[in-house]
Amino acid sequence: MELQAARACFALLWGCALAAAAAAQGKEVVLLDFAAAGGELGWLTHPYGKGWDLMQNIMNDMPIYMYSVCNVMSGDQDNWLRTNWVYRGEAERIFIELKFTVRDCNSFPGGASSCKETFNLYYAESDLDYGTNFQKRLFTKIDTIAPDEITVSSDFEARHVKLNVEERSVGPLTRKGFYLAFQDIGACVALLSVRVYYKKCPELLQGLAHFPETIAGSDAPSLATVAGTCVDHAVVPPGGEEPRMHCAVDGEWLVPIGQCLCQAGYEKVEDACQACSPGFFKFEASESPCLECPEHTLPSPEGATSCECEEGFFRAPQDPASMPCTRPPSAPHYLTAVGMGAKVELRWTPPQDSGGREDIVYSVTCEQCWPESGECGPCEASVRYSEPPHGLTRTSVTVSDLEPHMNYTFTVEARNGVSGLVTSRSFRTASVSINQTEPPKVRLEGRSTTSLSVSWSIPPPQQSRVWKYEVTYRKKGDSNSYNVRRTEGFSVTLDDLAPDTTYLVQVQALTQEGQGAGSKVHEFQTLSPEGSGNLAVIGGVAVGVVLLLVLAGVGFFIHRRRKNQRARQSPEDVYFSKSEQLKPLKTYVDPHTYEDPNQAVLKFTTEIHPSCVTRQKVIGAGEFGEVYKGMLKTSSGKKEVPVAIKTLKAGYTEKQRVDFLGEAGIMGQFSHHNIIRLEGVISKYKPMMIITEYMENGALDKFLREKDGEFSVLQLVGMLRGIAAGMKYLANMNYVHRDLAARNILVNSNLVCKVSDFGLSRVLEDDPEATYTTSGGKIPIRWTAPEAISYRKFTSASDVWSFGIVMWEVMTYGERPYWELSNHEVMKAINDGFRLPTPMDCPSAIYQLMMQCWQQERARRPKFADIVSILDKLIRAPDSLKTLADFDPRVSIRLPSTSGSEGVPFRTVSEWLESIKMQQYTEHFMAAGYTAIEKVVQMTNDDIKRIGVRLPGHQKRIAYSLLGLKDQVNTVGIPI
């Protein structure tokens, strides 16, 4: 009776917890639902009439059914409950959800020694329905079902039954149908719900691709690849991948690959491609919306891929379809020709109508006419231009070597990118008459061993315009020196010449208008005296001896002077006593040496009016204030260029103002392709601003972290070469940067790297208390050479050390040098001889160069000129970059890839992925079934690719980290 009461009590209390089931992910297709059948299924019990029993209860005026069994007082129970035959259909893997309660064995008298608290779940596949024919041997055990919670006596008293929900899956199934069976071996169980279903990945529209409803696969670790179909008017972009997604076993879509884009003439509207409206166009398959037809185009029809130009307007072949149609420019404005002796200077102003383009160039042609005959012809071959006469961008040119008494006509044509599409020309002409004298006709009148007498003549009509003649002469073969004599007559004697020597002589008339045409260059030779052969030998020997004595004296003087200089230098200065100091290079001038910093700003920078500058958005914050992206009007006012704008914050101190202007005074002295370019300053208005060129990709360290693994080794070495070239330029100007790091390198859209940030304070040189402090914060210990940290000795050699750290940052895609070590630990490690290990996939030659930069003795480090030369050789011979340096992932990936903060293995996969900065792949690992560290350490390289890690750099980072992870797991004894 007590057992019957227990079963009845279960029937009354089971519904209190039934509503706790969670919705399954994906789409579920139900094959069997006991609770929904309302007791009409009529399952088979064995033995019949014993064990399992169908019970009914009324709850909320609705009948509720369950199968229960509670033969706990009798031993050797073997009670079976079998479902009806279930048709499998298209299912490959089925999921079985059970809701049940189990009573605590201790709630029965004497503890019921034969009582159990579990039951077994079985299944059997078959192609036929066997009806009531029940054979145990056909069934295969799925699992022993144990409750998470059991119902104890106090739960009965409180009318609270603890409901358990368990789910199991079976697959792959191959027969037409199947049975489920439940075996009781002596428990008090109430089976409230049995739901059997399989999962599908639902129909999906994503990335303009349609993915059909797909049955989830039967193999849990694998993902079923499903090809998508582009929607109407969408295509796979050239070079792109066909759209694919992966259907996981739980019915979830994972790992999307590829995409579709709306074709030319169509734009994306929600999940479809819609034709461009009239007046709009789209010229290629892309994610961009349709664009409005630009200026000077005709209205386009619906779905247009381009907009036709209006009559008289054109589009050059290289012009994008989004650019307005343009036309050839008008003629140059205000052409003038000013004669200056045998030269003419042509000047003009730009066309009043540029045609809507900025690529205006000019061509100059010349025609000469003889006054006597009136004949004219081209004269390009006989005149000389100050620069090539075609493709000029300036608005002036000088034409020389013009002939006297000749009329010249010069034509200046303006052209732009569409001028070649029309036959008409836009030009202006100017004529000028040359009244310059004819070249003098020179002849030799006499000569001796030490002199030459020459005379000349010009036509009588021109003699009245000449006020003097200029005679230029020099030894043949000597291009370094010459002599000039001026005279009012028509002859001259050149004295004090060397015997038996050939001289080059030219005569030129000087008029009020300037120099006239020069005569031909004549060769005249002095006479050889008697015995000139012996004298020449003796003279040559004497001259040679004298020269040797002079050179010896000069060499001795230089040696003594250098020796004295070295004696005055400290041992640390040996590096700077190289010959490069003797080169006549431009030298950097420290703006802080000026009593008034405004003087340095005026000398080295360009003042810009605030009206020429527009601030658009904040892109960062510097030491002195905010940094903006903005636009700067060019001097012509017709064009704007993007710039970066540093501002001086309100409430600045006088020292901050001096430092702010000092940085501008430094930048203004530099002009190099790999140094950030200063456009100008605003120092006369508030807020004060420093305007530099705009670098689209920002700081190098952040850029590399965002593009991890996307560049080839050759591209990375090219970036390093650019940085080294900029530093070579600074070193040649005797400028020491002191803060060279990837964060202070800016990258433009063409991947050109430029050195920036010249604001590091000078306090280090003057204040012995400021060992680790600048006006902007701490000294960058991780990038700074040991001698600079210890003795505040900043030199070009310490910049070379910093460049080695930058090389390491670039090759590791922006990793933090020395990882999480403290500054004190970094300094100690360096002094103990530790150097950063080789990065992953780093060429041996590059790592060797890093190690040279990190020589403890700074005199042994290479100069930047040497570094540029080495990198140039590597770039010219890419095969030399294929030999990789030895790589130990246990040292080189120092991110905590094998242990957590307490030195123990990671508890979760997501925690491990986050530690190696690969957390973006967490869902990929989870979807593929790698939910625990024990499973992850068994992965192969193919497994990493299969879950959707596509970038080679990311694949290697994960693979190398797994090596260390396996070692750690094996060390602590976690079973795998």
From Swiss-Prot:
- GO CC terms in record: cell surface; focal adhesion; lamellipodium; lamellipodium membrane; leading edge membrane; plasma membrane; receptor complex; ruffle membrane
Which Cys-Cys disulfides exist here?
A: 70-188, 105-115
- Which stretches of this protein does UniProt put in the Cytoplasmic compartment? 559-976
- What is its subcellular localisation? Cell membrane; Cell projection, Ruffle membrane; Cell projection, Lamellipodium membrane; Cell junction, Focal adhesion
Give residue ranges for domain Fibronectin type-III.
328-432, 438-529
| Calcium recorded as keyword | no
**Limits of the SAM domain:** 904-968
Reported impact of residue 646 to M: Loss of kinase activity
Residue ranges annotated as transmembrane are 538-558
Where, per the database record, does this protein carry Phosphotyrosine? 575, 588, 594, 628, 735, 772, 921, 930
* Membrane topology qualifier: Single-pass type I membrane protein
Q: What is this protein called?
A: Ephrin type-A receptor 2
Origin organism is Homo sapiens
